[in-house]
Amino acid sequence: MMAFSRLKRSEVAGWLREGVRRAALWMALAGLVSVRLAAWEADELERGEALARQHCAACHVFPEPGLLDRRTWEQHALRKMAPYMGVARLRTEGRPDGERLEESGVYPPGPVVTREEWQAIGRYYSARAPARAVGLEAPRPPAAPTVQFVARPLTIPGAVPRSTLASLSAQGGEAWLADAGTGAVHRFGADGRLLGAWGLGGAAVHAWRGEGLWAVTLIGSVFPSDVLAGRVVRLRTDGATDAWVEGLGRPVMSLPCDLNGDGRTDLVVNGFGNQLGRLSWHEGLPGGGWRAHEILGRPGAACTETRDVDGDGDVDLLVLMAQAQEQLVLLENDGHGDFSARILLQFHPVFGAVHFESVDMDGDGDLDVVMSNGDNGEYPSPFKAYHGVRVFRNDGGMRLAEAWFHPVHGAFKALARDFDGDGDLDVAAISFFPDYRRAPEESFLLLRNEGAWRFGRETIPGATLGRWLTMDAGDVDGDGDLDVLLGSFCEGPPAVEIPPGLATAWRTNGVNGLLLVNQRRR
């Protein structure tokens, strides 16, 4: 203290000035480093985005980071994509479809990007994705209970609900439920009484009604697989079956029609597959048998309609494709079974397209498109604000623009019908991945058309009696109005949180399906 007290004021001031100078210098250096670091990070993210746009958009629509939350990108989506970039290997040893996958070349033999480039892509998505789950918007008011329908449970004795087909249109006066566990089509009367069953030896997922027979599609493997175990059978009214086409990759639909104008029956087959798949048509040959023709050589053919869209007298195809390259495609037939493709709608790879149908929603005389997108089952994933039911309005030249959207988490199928008989089309919708904790009634919704693109929300008291995978509409009791049939599949990917008590009830309550009897005529 004595030594310090003898210092001249000028010396003390000098020390202080030097300290301030050095502090300012260090702060300037730190600021410069911070600026340069921020610039480097910005450059790295820009580089990661450029790499993502180059490589991800080479296979499908570029997925913007905001489509998923950060955790889902890091723990699921990027890991799922790594084998397609050759930076990780998908283990195929011991898989029934392993050899087929290895031979297909669906995964590159070596890296498409370097390890460092892949990490740059990952850093870009991690930095730009939102931290919170996407789609957790404020809950909508609960749907009101409807008086339109009375629910009749349908029970397959001893069968845990694994319904893969619900049909009211296959056989007049009957409700059909196909069950993956029993491998049969179970037939119910309009009163809910079980009439009998036809054993098919597999899970039926689609039935097309013809004159005295049905073309029934058996998927082969309900869960994702590329084993060629699917088939189409001809089912007669006495329950006898004939094999039509076998060795298919998870077919989900088959439509008999004449595609080449030779007067013989051909088959359009939606080979949904998994990593592999194709949309094909099978030419009926003069002496019997079929010749296969590939139309689209990729997986994801989810739903097809046969229509003469261009008015030239032959059968064209409208096809909804899922599995990354999500599109609605018009395939125009030249009259001989050769097709030219026109993409009507295109979506990002996590859009989750599941089903569509073409109907005249606005009454202007041309066909609009009603679409449901809510497939949320590939991995645990947050609810998505862009999942729901949409109407795309046709301008008369098959140019489609979205006219209406109703958010529904996990929307799986939507049917536009005049359920209340007022002359316009309402929408019945099911969800396989709803928010069971906050909005369980969205398992089934009746969206009642109120005009001017406004729809009221209604549900049924038994909406959570099953996990609805499949649905159909038709007049099962012959009273002139449209009833609805729901099929419950209580298993499936654990992509959304399901309360344990609800999952147990699905397995044990004996509700394999629900017949919703329309009360309009009563």
Q: Where are the model-predicted features located?
A:
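Bacterial N-terminal signal peptides that target proteins for export
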Residues: 7-24
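Sec/Tat signal peptide C-region and signal peptidase I cleavage site
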Residues: 36-38
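Bacterial N-terminal signal peptides
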Residues: 22-34
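Short metal-coordination and nucleic-acid-contact micro-motifs, chiefly zinc-binding Cys/His arrays
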Residues: 52
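Beta-propeller-forming repeat regions
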Residues: 40-47, 55-522
